[in-house]
Amino acid sequence: MHSQFGKHKSDISLLTPAPPSPKAFGLLYAAHWLGSTDPEIWERLETLANENQCLIDLRDEKVPGTYETQLFVIGYAGNIVTVLKQLQDYIDEPNNFDRFDIDRRPRKETLKMCVPTDMFLSKFGVGLVAEGRITHYEQNRGVTIKTYAISQSQHVISVYSNENNHQLPLHDLVEYFAYPSQCYEKSFAQKIPYLVDNKSGLLNRFKDISKLDVIKTPRDQLWLMALDGMKTVDARESILQALRENPDSASLYVRACKLEHLPSCKMEWLLHALQRDTLDDKMKIIKHAETYFRGPAILQILESAVLSLSNDIHIVRELAIAHEKSGNFEKSMQFLKDCIDNNSWNSTELTASMIHCEHAGANRTSKVYLEAMYSIFNFTTSEEAALIEIVKVLVETDSPLSAKSLSLELMTRYAGTPTFEKTRQLFHSLFYTTCSKSDSERYDDTFIKHMAKWNKKQQEQQK
């Protein structure tokens, strides 16, 4: 028997992007529980699953080494605990997931759950350390805990209530483990023996198997694989299959990169991903590259990206920033200007890039966007309010250099107009409290010079 309630984000496959990564929690329960004919319970399970955007998966497949079958709650981190808390209210005997005590005698107050071995070791440790932590948990909760491995990748934890404690708070144990089992986003565990040299790159193998026909993995098999604790070898093998089925997923290429150990292998994956014209999120690759590489390496990745994506303004911007930081800004300055000219950007987009560049410490790159800003305005009286608003945005987003440059340009452009004094007062209120003495004097000198010029012009008109 096998029943599922609820949908996993519009009933899409596990291999479909659905951030944040799904989590799964497995419970063992007595096989007879599946035979319940109470329609109200089944209706409530379906409602509960749909309300919390998760999937409740009931299976009567035997768990190795146990007499029990499994109930899985699959969903998102914050929803799992909520679902398990409410499950206790929906089932008449909330602790009947295991019908056997430590001596295999019938007993209702026992709870069992499956967790990946890696999670078990990270929470309890090994040897005397594990014994001490388990004992501490037992004393605090008034329970008895027994653990054993059912496979290389999964542990079973049995919790037995003491005579004076017949209430086993299920959600308390779940929260203690803080999302015990992970369904890896867009990859799954392959249950096949495959030895992988962890220091060798995966890309060549991926290119080899990509020549074969792609066989989609059955959905039921995906659930079972995802729920099994996944080892590094499993992950390396499964990411290749996942990429074969989803060759344009930037998230999968990033995951493949993370599984590599050598920087050269990481770079190979990123360069390979950027060569795909149909990649769904190229900037995701760039941002990931910037967390791993510096100097010549990041320049190589960015230059490779620009070759295939010469009109992608965001990637060209990142290349210009990298060139400026390496002292070779002139190498990409004209290319950046041409790219801006070829993309009809509005003031909002240009302002966002100015802020991004200044925060990245690339002031010369930011200046290119500022000059592009000048070209889309005629600096008429009707445009004054919009320009002043841009200055305010730059100030509020902690981009003082761009804000000061634009403010001085506006003072120059609007000198000799009736609105100049109002504009100057605004600049004064925005900057004089935070700028240096030299900047203050610079603003005043600019104001005095242009006011003198404007007064002289007014006097000549009156004659």
Swiss-Prot record:
Superkingdom to which the source organism belongs: Eukaryota
Q: What is this protein called?
A: Uncharacterized protein F58F12.3
